[in-house]
């Protein structure tokens, strides 16, 4: 830790305090995440350290780079590249009645998908995507933070500050207690974030697991075995759930054109086996008029 100086506390993440810091030798500004683990006494589990070490290899222009993993007094510090703004703060800063330019919405979504395809192709899930862990710079680049941390540390029910971890972006199969979930959980989260980037409002903002499910059901219809084989056998599925018909997404989601709504509906398909993959989503006609050559992952690297 002697290599870094803490400059200031910049926030509280899912796992602990985040500081802005500086690498003493190079002057590089970094984000330092102090990981606070459930059972402090036992120190950092070796499995977590193994998982985290693998994440240093996830190098992509749309993934926040993990630069270093340090231990100090049985505390784990993760050193990441520094970006000053997250998507949530950015959306909150847009004046009432104004929205993100439609081309930037498209560009952000495409870049998010590029980062996700990269991680999914390396069998790394995120599991906890939300606007707070999408970081942006002032050049139109968006990067995904905290990839792979859920597997290393689990997702706590409450942040260490006792704030409840948000359910708004959580896939229907996770909310219904499925234990065999995979890459489609991230695609669902991206769908909900897509709607929020366009409208500045969370698509499904429940304040408990059941409220979250019912908000989804009211919008998309209550799922059954017909639309999603096996849903009725998931551990948190109840036959007593009200049977909503579901309306159309377009009534909830303004500012997204027809192609965008088509893509959104494919990302929010209940059955994970039928939900569009991140790779397929990138090929959707919604992105036909996006200039992809200028995106960071498409720059020809020397």
From Swiss-Prot:
Query: Which residues are annotated with the PTM Phosphothreonine?
Result: 14, 161
User: Which is an annotated Pfam family here?
Assistant: Pkinase
List where in the cell it is found.
Nucleus
PANTHER family xrefs: CELL DIVISION PROTEIN KINASE (PTHR24056), CYCLIN-DEPENDENT KINASE 1 (PTHR24056:SF334)
What keywords are annotated for this sequence in UniProt? ATP-binding, Cell cycle, Cell division, Kinase, Mitosis, Nucleotide-binding, Nucleus, Phosphoprotein, Serine/threonine-protein kinase, Transferase
Provenance organism: Xenopus laevis (African clawed frog)
The record ties this protein, via CDD domains, to: STKc_CDK1_euk (cd07861)
Recorded GO molecular functions are: ATP binding; cyclin-dependent protein serine/threonine kinase activity; protein serine kinase activity; protein serine/threonine kinase activity; RNA polymerase II CTD heptapeptide repeat kinase activity
Record-level GO cellular component terms: cytosol; nucleus
* PTM characteristics: Phosphorylation at Tyr-15 by wee1 and wee2 inhibits the protein kinase activity and acts negative regulator of entry into mitosis (G2 to M transition).
Keyword Oxidoreductase recorded: no
Family of this protein: Belongs to the protein kinase superfamily. CMGC Ser/Thr protein kinase family. CDC2/CDKX subfamily.
Q: Where is the Protein kinase domain?
A: 4-287
Phosphotyrosine: modified positions? 15
* Record field: catalytic activity: L-seryl-[protein] + ATP = O-phospho-L-seryl-[protein] + ADP + H(+); L-threonyl-[protein] + ATP = O-phospho-L-threonyl-[protein] + ADP + H(+); [DNA-directed RNA polymerase] + ATP = phospho-[DNA-directed RNA polymerase] + ADP + H(+)
Give residues where Phosphoserine occurs.
Answer: 277
Primary role: Plays a key role in the control of the eukaryotic cell cycle by modulating the centrosome cycle as well as mitotic onset; promotes G2-M transition via association with multiple interphase cyclins. During G2 and early mitosis, CDC25A/B/C-mediated dephosphorylation activates CDK1/cyclin complexes which phosphorylate several substrates that trigger at least centrosome separation, Golgi dynamics, nuclear envelope breakdown and chromosome condensation.
The protein in question is named Cyclin-dependent kinase 1-B
């Amino acid at each position: 830790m002697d290599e870094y100086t803490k400059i200031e506390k910049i926030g509280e993440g899912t796992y602990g305090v985040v500081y802005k810091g500086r690498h003493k030798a190079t002057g590089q500004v970094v984000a330092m995440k102090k990981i606070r683990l459930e059972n402090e006494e036992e120190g950092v589990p070796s499995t977590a350290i193994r998982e985290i070490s693998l994440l240093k290899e996830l190098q992509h222009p749309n993934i926040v780079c993990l630069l270093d993993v340090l231990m100090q007094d049985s505390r784990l510090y993760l050193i990441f590249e520094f970006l000053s703004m997250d998507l949530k703060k950015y959306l909150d800063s847009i004046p009432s009645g104004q929205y993100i330019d439609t081309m930037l919405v498209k560009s952000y979504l495409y870049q998010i998908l590029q980062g996700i395809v990269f991680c999914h192709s390396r069998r790394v899930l995120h599991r906890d995507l939300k606007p707070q862990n999408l970081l942006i710079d002032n050049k139109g680049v968006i990067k995904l933070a905290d990839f792979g941390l859920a597997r290393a540390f689990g997702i706590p029910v409450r942040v260490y500050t006792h704030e409840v971890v948000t359910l708004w972006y959580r896939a229907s199969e996770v909310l219904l207690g499925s234990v065999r979930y995979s890459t489609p959980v991230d695609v669902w989260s991206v769908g909900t974030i897509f709607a929020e980037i366009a409208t500045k409002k969370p698509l499904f903002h429940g304040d408990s697991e059941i409220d979250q499910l019912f908000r989804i059901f009211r919008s998309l219809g209550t799922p059954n075995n017909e639309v999603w084989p096996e849903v009725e056998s998931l551990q948190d599925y109840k036959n007593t759930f009200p049977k909503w018909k579901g309306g159309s997404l377009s009534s909830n989601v303004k500012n997204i054109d027809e192609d965008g709504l088509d893509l959104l509906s494919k990302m929010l398909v209940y059955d994970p086996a039928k939900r569009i993959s991140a790779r397929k989503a990138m090929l959707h006609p919604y992105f036909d008029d996006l200039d992809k050559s200028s995106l960071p992952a498409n720059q020809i690297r020397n």
